[in-house]
Amino acid sequence: MNYQVPRGTQDILPKDIRKWHRLEELIRQFCHVYNYDEIRTPIFEHTNVFKRGNDSSDMVNKEMYTFQLENSSTSLTLRPEGTAGVARAFVEHKMYGYADLPMKMYYVGPQCRHERPQKGRMRIFNQFG
């Protein structure tokens, strides 16, 4: 049995978590000053949220963690970036109808890409956008 994190991932240990909390708090404070609202979307979405018509980008073709639900035609993908999920939420919840436009939103959280790990590049990483 293998008791190590998968290649390209890492644990954030108690000795380091305060730094992460502080960074996230600074991001939230900065965004609050400029009237941005935080949005949180699911860690996985329907695969078509990330696929665009005729998209041949590496991220779509090679770097997404996609899985098929058992006994179903449903395909889900771990989010490789945050923007597509935010756009999906904006449309799904008709946010254009009850908010002043343009809306100013931000997200911060883990993203997952199946890319070759290298120095400074992990398969699970945090992104602010």
Task: Describe these PLM feature segments.
Residues 1-129:
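TRNA-recognition modules of translation machinery and tRNA-sensing kinases, especially anticodon-binding
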